[in-house]
Amino acid sequence: MLQPKKTKFRKQFKGRIHGAAKGGTDLNFGSYGLKALEPERVTARQIEAARRAITREMKRQGRVWIRIFPDVPVTQKPTEVRMGSGKGSPEYWAARVHPGRVMFEIDGVAEDIAREALRLGAAKLPVRTRFIQRIVD
């Protein structure tokens, strides 16, 4: 699973996801992509599950690019622990996804396979998505 090699601080504020994505809204690598339509925090496990679903449907042909990276540590307190006494320990990593952000790109497969692969990948994610493709003039 994806996670940063090293961070300056162990814990981070929760934060909010306001507004549309500033960058990463266009296809840069592949011919087809999966674009987020709403703000959400996507965990490293969800990204990996989507990647596996996409790769399996493509039968390991073509190429997959993951355009988001989980760089936010999410903390949790153990179960049945009273409130107070500090913040919990970092449990997993998540990526903040803004609306309009391209999350996955694929290339080297036919459009129908790409559509189905990204549909299966989108089912693993907690965010509404849209299939996009490069416009060739």
UniProtKB/Swiss-Prot annotation:
PROSITE patterns: RIBOSOMAL_L16_1 (PS00586), RIBOSOMAL_L16_2 (PS00701). Keywords: Ribonucleoprotein, Ribosomal protein, RNA-binding, rRNA-binding, tRNA-binding. It comes from the Bacteria. One of its GO terms (biological process) is translation. One of its GO terms (molecular function) is rRNA binding. One of its GO terms (cellular component) is cytosolic large ribosomal subunit. Part of the 50S ribosomal subunit. Belongs to the universal ribosomal protein uL16 family. Binds 23S rRNA and is also seen to make contacts with the A and possibly P site tRNAs. This is Large ribosomal subunit protein uL16. It comes from Methylobacterium nodulans (strain LMG 21967 / CNCM I-2342 / ORS 2060).
